[in-house]
Swiss-Prot record:
Official protein name in the record: Solute carrier family 22 member 22
Keyword GTP-binding: no
CDD domains (alphabetical): MFS_OAT
Summary of the function given for this chain in its UniProt record: Sodium-independent organic anion transporter which exhibits high specificity for a subset of prostaglandins including prostaglandin E2 (PGE2), prostaglandin E1 (PGE1), prostaglandin F2-alpha (PGF2-alpha) and prostaglandin D2 (PGD2).
Main location group: membrane
Sequence similarity: Belongs to the major facilitator (TC 2.A.1) superfamily. Organic cation transporter (TC 2.A.1.19) family.
GO biological process: monoatomic ion transport; sodium-independent prostaglandin transport
Topological domain spans for side Cytoplasmic: 1-15, 166-172, 221-231, 280-347, 398-405, 456-466, 513-554
Top-level division of the source organism's lineage: Eukaryota
Thermal dependence summary for this entry: High activity at 37 degrees Celsius. Little or no activity at 0 degrees Celsius.
Gene: Slc22a22
Amino acid sequence: MDFDEILHHVGDSGRFQICMIILLNILSLVLSPHDVLENFTAAIPAHHCSINLDNSRSEVSTDMNLTTEDLMKVSIPMGPNQKPEQCRRFRYTQWQFLDSNISTFNSTELETEPCLDGWTYDHSVFTSTIVTEWDLVCDFQSFKYYAQATSLAGHLVSCPLSGIISDRFGRKPLLMYCSLAYGAVGTYCAFAPNFSVYCVLRFLLSAFQSTILINSLILVLEEASVQWHPTIIVLSGLFNSIGQGVLGGLAYVISDWHLLQLAYALPFFIFFVLFCWVPESVRWLIITGKTDQAWKELQRIASINGKKGIAQNLTTEDLRSKLKKDVNSTGKLFRIKDIFINPLIRKIVLSNSSLLFAELFSFVGLLLDVQLLGKNMFLTQIFLGAIDVPSKSLTYFTIRNVSRRPLIAFLLLTTGSCITITIFISEEMYVLRTIIFILGKGCFAAFTCISTTYINELSPVELRSTLNGVFLAVVRLAGVLSALTLATRKYFVYLPMILYGVLPIVATISILFLPETFNLPHTDIIKDMEKRKRLMSKNISKKEGQDFLETTEC
């Protein structure tokens, strides 16, 4: 009796699995906004230098009734866009600007200075953000993007570590303690005393977020029937997108960054309690030899699924038999360096990494700063989340009917073109800019689904998890560098957009070095990949080709 048969006896698609899927989707809904939360908690409102009139330097007494508009006129110079300068003020108060008899002044020749007394912020949209709290504007504006890069670096560190810890100690303990830690650290983050502490806490939160998302998905998949796996993955992806859309509406209601951070941190104390109830992965328990505990967990699952009587007939000997079978079927373990020894694998890793890096680099940066996309950032965030639903749904059908290489090339070219076109559209035409960005976001969402499928089709079973780890590291690195690229706006305002637009277009060349996998059998070992390559180039005998098709899975 193998594990799938054992799981079928206690129920592999019953009430327990439904509860687990619901829990996973709620987790996805709450966790998915983590990386884009700083679109709102770190939003940059309109601002100008604080006005501090110094009578000792003034030529006119200030004992008069002056409106805010008058004070701005005599204290803040106008910028090239005929709006008040955000980072400079007049060195001396220019009282002559109040004289209605004088029509024009050339304010560009007047002496200015930085904002020595701080800034005044427009609180009409956001009552508080980390930008207003720690004055992350002007010369310090790049600190916002450094904070985002630091946060994304938490994912880069946690992905390999969480996998090792999870395989060593189990899924459940990691989910329990990371949920508790996310709630505690997230709550403290909402009241961080300074910017440095805030960055460290966001780094930790990202590490916990990745760990929870990855291990919760693994736990649910390991406890469910294989036929449920596509549905589970698609639902998780859709709730990810819905969660990002919900963030736009929630941020509109909660305009204080402290409260918004708390709103996403406090639910994890509830998740901690729920994970205390969730059984450990039976599959992991069997593989690690904990058959007695696995038997107890199977009894719980059977009871929830209404099959308690059937489960009573299951003995620990059945589980030990399954364990023995798994141990005997274990083959050679591959190391990371083995990927780069084989030229075929090496070419796949390098080419596919360039595609993933380009696409993720181009759009992650934009998702981290939706203020670039249009005037109403709340609606933009909602639309960016909503567009994923039809996009990912449509992708399900294109995967079944369209070749991989031309589809991926089309998505890369469209994404890069959408970003590049917006450079030439003025900010006043924000509706058109938003529509084009949403089209690009739809292509990005489709790319994430199709690339996941393509990676699994390219990778042999014996190397699949290792290659996925390599590609995941590339994706996280792209996110970190994408956030840092936003800081280059202070040198040339269009530089991030140029890089985001050009890179996917250039990276399309890499698709030429990858094989087509549509309607071809999946491979189990590297030798199967080499046979598949020869089959496509017709450099293989008829008998070898027939053997290959018979011995590989479709």
